Amino acid sequence: MAGAATGSRTPGRSELVEGCGWRCPEHGDRVAELFCRRCRRCVCALCPVLGAHRGHPVGLALEAAVHVQKLSQECLKQLAIKKQQHIDNITQIEDATEKLKANAESSKTWLKGKFTELRLLLDEEEALAKKFIDKNTQLTLQVYREQADSCREQLDIMNDLSNRVWSISQEPDPVQRLQAYTATEQEMQQQMSLGELCHPVPLSFEPVKSFFKGLVEAVESTLQTPLDIRLKESINCQLSDPSSTKPGTLLKTSPSPERSLLLKYARTPTLDPDTMHARLRLSADRLTVRCGLLGSLGPVPVLRFDALWQVLARDCFATGRHYWEVDVQEAGAGWWVGAAYASLRRRGASAAARLGCNRQSWCLKRYDLEYWAFHDGQRSRLRPRDDLDRLGVFLDYEAGVLAFYDVTGGMSHLHTFRATFQEPLYPALRLWEGAISIPRLP
């Protein structure tokens, strides 16, 4: 080996024998000083010429051994790197395992809190529904009692009159009988005409039962689909949305009420020309607003929006329940439909003046086939089944509910805002192009 290290001297035969350590199996008296690259074995010098390895590529065995040593060292290096990779993989998998366990526990804790919140909301809803029934029952019973008391008073009057008439009929003195009859005649004539029959109007709680029946059916309809399928649909839907930040969130559904129930609170609010932008035009009945080419001339009202194509209704609601509809078929690529306080800023195009971008307003927005719910700058993505043509807006002022429905889509629920309203609410619109109308409701 020392001779091989010099690199310039050809190894001697004895060194080759010592290096190889064994003789040729075919020519046993000769040293196996060569290495057959094809057969991968050591041979003597005669084998490539006369033996079984005739014509095979060969080289010095010691040189092949040095090359093999280098290959072995390279293999050891690669094995060490690969072993470290597997060790790193195990570490990452163990870290991911711990994170997954922690995430699973935190998710279950979150779910427990949400279901507790849901139960509390259901309990509160049940209490409110029962309170509604009790309140209306007491009001109706009070009316019934007043009607019954009135009937009893009439009975007492008629009983008294009956006694007096009987006494008159039994009076033996003709003069006294005539005088008594004459004094009572007018009252007798008044009481002899038959009174009206009283038929108490029964109080029905079917609308309440129908509403909560629809709620239960909507929940049951959703839960009939296996949970894994619902979650998969939700994940796929949200992953297709680049703006989504919470893939896997469950979809909120709300029951769709019958339109006939909402029409009990129907309103047809008219629009206020003093609030609309100068580029907007109002129809004669003040129910349709459209974009114009030029601004209107004349004095500028102080209530007018001077930068945004917005308009408020003349009518406002500060108590009770109200329902109106908005037709957006001709509104083009973009529109905003909602409600706002009169304190909404009218000057400039800042967030304080934009519908839905402040605490004074709530709205649904459509632009470029995307739908959003906006309030105070916070937005929620909406995914209606079809493009919206007409919206229904329901306001329950005391309950703090402002809900939106797809009228042409079977009154499917779009979004509900919940708030404690502090000022009267005005229906509000904003246009991008085209026209928006408020239909007359029956």
UniProtKB/Swiss-Prot annotation:
Entries under InterPro entries matching the protein: B30.2/SPRY, B30.2/SPRY_sf, Butyrophylin_SPRY, ConA-like_dom_sf, E3_ubiq-ligase_TRIM/RNF, PRY, SPRY_dom, SPRY_PRY_TRIM14
B30.2/SPRY domain location: 249-442
Tissue: Highest expression in liver; undetectable in skeletal muscle.
B box-type zinc finger locations on the chain: 19-61
Pfam families listed in its UniProt record: PRY, SPRY, zf-B_box
GO molecular function, one term: transcription coactivator activity
GO biological process: inflammatory response; innate immune response; negative regulation of viral transcription; positive regulation of DNA-binding transcription factor activity; positive regulation of NF-kappaB transcription factor activity
GO cellular component, one term: cytoplasm
Residue runs in coiled coils: 76-109, 135-156
Induction: By interferons alpha and gamma in a STAT1-dependent way.
Family: Belongs to the TRIM/RBCC family.
Protein name listed in UniProt: Tripartite motif-containing protein 14
